[in-house]
Amino acid sequence: MSRPQDATNSTHRNGSGTEQSEPWLSTVEISNLGVIHDATVDLSRGLTVITGETGAGKTMMVQSLSLLLGRRAESGWVRHGADSAVVTGVYEVSPGQTDHPALRAVEDAGGVVEDELIVTRRVSAAGRSVAAAGGTRMPVRTLA
């Protein structure tokens, strides 16, 4: 029987069988995505709740997270009048987490992972999408 995981300290077993905490998304920066002109959202470990009035940008916040996770981008998400939308996520990485599958995928694609991993998605008004992680451009599918 497996023990339940604490939502504030998600863990996985590395190759040597020891547990390590997961990298966690600490900051999301959003520019020109839907109704959001420019926003920075600082997240904390555990549960973060996003609330607001109709039209405040809650859906665009969820869309920004989906872009960071490699979802297909839609040109209609770009703010009217803007050339492109940009979403940047900062993941906090603890020492010794390089064995995590997502971090290995970024390193295998040429990205650099240190105490934080910066992931960026740019979506043009024409629908083209570019992804970068760890300072290196890479295929969007690497983020998935």
Residue ranges and their predicted role:
Residues 1-15:
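N-terminal acidic, proline/glycine-rich, low-complexity intrinsically disordered segments
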Residues 19-144:
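Gly/Lys-enriched N-terminal cap/neck module of very large, oligomeric protein machines
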